């Protein structure tokens, strides 16, 4: 689904749904309050957020894995596999599996490191450890206590913040801001801070918990689009962020097509976009997360732009990995 407008700007619909949201929040509060879950013999870092929709979790998870790799640590990803039908635990095969099997994010992550899909996070973590993982990076799961975490990174979109401050479905919040931030080992604020979050977040953090600022930048492959006309489409949490990124790098976005997050593309969805791009003399462009959901025959006809997270203080991020992740590794 696409996030409704009232999730960001409060209105009558949000107030009408508030009672349902309070029930959702109570259920989450009850789940999070369960006793600590299974503790692995290896470090577990969770990359999560407090809201539904895209905040930049996947690029951060990839950055964590890259930091582990540079330290000689064998890391495995662990995902619930949202949108896929397989319950797992199962190792993601980028060639043999499709998004209908394991979801889109695991397919993207599996191109970087071994990735496991498991509805039961504890079972997935145990299988990863048994398969040789020296650390586990969880994609999402901040509100899931079944697997004990050594570090919880809470990712926040600086341009969206916490929306209207209400709970799903009245707003985007999965749980209360105070409770979610209290469990954070660090907060990563991504993008322009239009919500004054750098001042609003720290009072809710435990002493010594850092707030890191970062931005998303397109990969080097985006350079070929500078000055060219593009027809852009995306089915992510906030498609407009992708369109703005293309404009900022110098591409001429002549048409844009937003789809719902995790949208399962069919050939009938993509062909009109390809035809439009051809008619305009433009390049059809989408995100790397969308690319894994494209019909195989049409995938080669679409240009793909990935993004990476760039920290404003990279040494602070590196220190976080050293202190909170590698400290649990056997010497």
Curated annotation (Swiss-Prot):
Keyword vocabulary terms for this entry: ATP-binding, Kinase, Lipid A biosynthesis, Lipid biosynthesis, Lipid metabolism, Nucleotide-binding, Transferase
SUPFAM superfamilies: P-loop containing nucleoside triphosphate hydrolases (SSF52540)
Entry protein name: Tetraacyldisaccharide 4'-kinase
Family, as annotated: Belongs to the LpxK family.
One GO term (biological process): lipopolysaccharide core region biosynthetic process
Binding site for ATP: 51-58
A GO CC annotation given for this chain: plasma membrane
Class of enzymatic activity (EC top level): transferase
HAMAP family xrefs: LpxK
Catalyzed reactions per annotation: a lipid A disaccharide + ATP = a lipid IVA + ADP + H(+)
